[in-house]
Amino acid sequence: ASLATEWAALPDNPNVWRFKLRQDVTYHDGAAFDSEDVVFSLNRAMADGSDMKELLSSVKEVRAVDAHTVDIETHGANPLLVNNLTNMFMVDKGWAEANDVMTPHDVAKGETNFATMNTNGTGAFKLVSRSIDEKTVLTANPNYWGKGIYPSQVTEIIYTPIQSSATRVAALLSGEVDIIQDVPVQDLGRVGSTAGLKVGTAAQNRVIFFGVDNADGPTADLRVRQAMNIAINRE
């Protein structure tokens, strides 16, 4: 988070966004983070086979202005660009070259590469080990640039995938795990009333669209659709 400290569309060209990068940021292996990595990472995300390609479909070109300034030019003004970039993760170009992961692998085809099991980020936690569908272990990054901004007492994180929601809840209640997401609706009361546990909730800013078949069945009748609309409690 916050690898860019400033960003804005250029006053004379709304199709170009300029990003100022945070300085003195290093990857987990000690390599410096700079604009070359941003250009590489976004071009990699736009490559064929990338799951992130659609989010950057409006991008025409990514250019390094200097070591800590990047321009992103789009095909026409795109006010959603900054929001879409929050889903992008930076990859150290040198690390990618050294480990032959310059291009993304095709997850849909079951392909794997070095980056499937390894990573070299800039964040608060660095990867210790990863076993797909079993366990991923992270440890605190002692050189994290944001330690003074985002203080944390957590030194280790262990992710344990549990497919069954009932099993996840049981693991939480027994103390096998410390946190789960999301708590099934039917278990909110039981979890919330258990000593030492707390259910966290927050409002979401999103739209859920319900489409109805207006060509066949009961909803083909305009009156039914109007009744459904009236029945919604908008309060």
Please provide the spans of the model-predicted regions.
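Solvent-exposed coil/turn segments that connect beta secondary-structure elements
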Residues: 12-14, 22-24, 38, 43, ...
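Ligand-binding "clamshell"
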Residues: 56-57, 189-201
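N-terminal lobe/hinge region of extracytoplasmic solute-binding protein
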Residues: 1-12, 43, 120
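Ligand-site clamp/hinge motif
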Residues: 22, 113, 143-190, 218, ...
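Surface-exposed binding/hinge segments that line
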Residues: 20, 54-104, 131
